[in-house]
């Protein structure tokens, strides 16, 4: 079969591209190795729609996040949870950024930052500033249903699940992709596989993105009434976040120190657990960590202890469940904690574009390369 575009990956970036190109009349094929869309990073993350507060050491990342925040809210407001207080605080110890610097950063970025008394939320002496901000959380399952409804109305878009590409080759002015029982060709290939981006590059003999891989855990928590409508993020160092997880009624707990269980610096993700998973995962072919028989033990004892050290006792929370996923991070980002979206044209004819982004609302960066 011949298409205008073949898209690898049915996360947000893949389905956004499919919907946009399909609505323009293009014939699109999406290939997803999992049995359903949004099974990995689009679902398994903090679900934070970034306004930029997270990046006081990377003004460029903050500005881009703020720029796209309003557009994302307008386009996908139906999946957002907006009715809660999002509190950012700066730790009095071991933080790269203090309260005064955070205020200056927010003023420079033009984003809301209203002082609140740290002792309202935190134990004495632990935070030198606390701020009410404007930031929301999205519900990946609601967003997924919307995209599937949109794509179902486009007969020129086909999405195939449980179809992992096994071979990709250049044939004249097209890419030929084999996946499962199908062979498809298109003059345009979009690599939107996120943590699998270098797996595709390796198949084609292309240079890898310079990334490290973190095997990450998001802990879902039930919370006391006092926390139900509040999100807490303590900056800017080895701290934590506890905030609503979309519209699920649960909160996500993450920690800079304990959310990443292991890190791989190889060009394709390589971890000891791949020797213990019964062959379902290997370097160059990442399985879904959340479904893996070799997924790690929860870091709940460490994360919860850290959060309880900071939070006043009245803000209670309890373990519900854990979600695991692989997070690729550009090695260059280790210096300033930036999270640039990389959209790179790897080949002109036939066209191959690879995208890597750790933020939901910078999906619009794809617009400049989709050719619609």
Regions found by a protein language model. Name each.
Residues 301-372:
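C-terminal catalytic lobe of FAD-dependent flavoproteins
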Residues 260-327:
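Flavin-binding catalytic cores
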Residues 3-29:
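N-terminal Rossmann-like FAD-binding beta1-loop-alpha1 element of flavoenzymes
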Residues 22-43:
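Glycine-rich FAD pyrophosphate-binding loop
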Residues 131-188, 192-202, 363-371:
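Helical element adjacent to the flavin cofactor pocket in flavoenzyme catalytic cores
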Residues 38, 182, 186-235, 245-250, ...:
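Central helical "cap/lid" subdomain
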Residues 46-129:
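Dinucleotide-binding Rossmann-like beta1-alpha1 core, especially the glycine-rich loop
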Residues 80-90, 116-154, 158, 176-177, ...:
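Helix-loop-beta segment of a Rossmann-like dinucleotide-binding subdomain
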């Amino acid at each position: 079969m011949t298409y205008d575009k073949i898209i690898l990956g049915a996360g947000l970036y893949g389905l956004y591209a499919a919907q946009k190109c399909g609505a323009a009349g293009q014939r699109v094929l999406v290939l997803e190795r999992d049995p359903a869309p949004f099974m990995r990073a689009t679902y398994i993350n903090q679900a934070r729609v970034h306004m930029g507060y997270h990046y006081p050491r990377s003004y460029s990342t903050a500005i881009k996040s703020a720029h796209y925040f309003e557009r994302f809210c307008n386009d996908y407001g139906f999946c957002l949870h907006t009715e809660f207080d999002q509190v950012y605080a700066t730790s009095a110890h071991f933080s790269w950024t203090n309260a005064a610097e955070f205020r200056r950063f927010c003023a420079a970025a033009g984003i809301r930052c209203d002082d609140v008394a740290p002792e309202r939320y935190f134990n004495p002496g632990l935070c030198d500033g606390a701020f009410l901000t404007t930031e929301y959380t999205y519900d990946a399952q609601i967003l997924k249903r919307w995209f599937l409804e949109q794509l179902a109305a486009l007969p020129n878009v086909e999405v195939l699940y449980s179809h992992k590409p096994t071979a990709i080759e250049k044939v004249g002015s097209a890419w030929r992709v084999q996946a499962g029982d199908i062979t498809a060709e298109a003059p345009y290939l979009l690599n939107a596989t996120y943590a699998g981006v270098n797996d595709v590059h390796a198949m084609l003999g292309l240079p890898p993105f310079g990334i490290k891989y973190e095997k990450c855990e998001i802990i879902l928590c039930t919370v006391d009434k006092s926390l139900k409508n509040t999100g807490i993020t303590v900056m800017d160092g080895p701290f934590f976040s506890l905030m609503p997880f979309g519209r699920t009624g649960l909160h996500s707990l993450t920690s800079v120190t304990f959310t990443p269980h292991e890190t791989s610096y190889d060009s394709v993700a390589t971890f000891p657990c791949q020797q213990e998973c019964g062959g379902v995962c290997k370097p160059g072919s990442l399985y879904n960590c959340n479904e893996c028989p070799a997924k790690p033990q929860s870091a709940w004892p460490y994360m919860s202890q850290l959060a309880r050290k900071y939070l006043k006792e009245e803000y209670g929370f309890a373990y519900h469940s854990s979600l695991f996923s692989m997070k690729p991070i550009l090695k260059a980002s280790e210096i300033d904690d930036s999270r640039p979206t990389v959209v790179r044209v790897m080949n002109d004819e036939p066209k191959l574009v690879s995208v890597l982004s750790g933020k939901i609302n910078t999906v619009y960066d794809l617009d400049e390369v989709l050719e619609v």
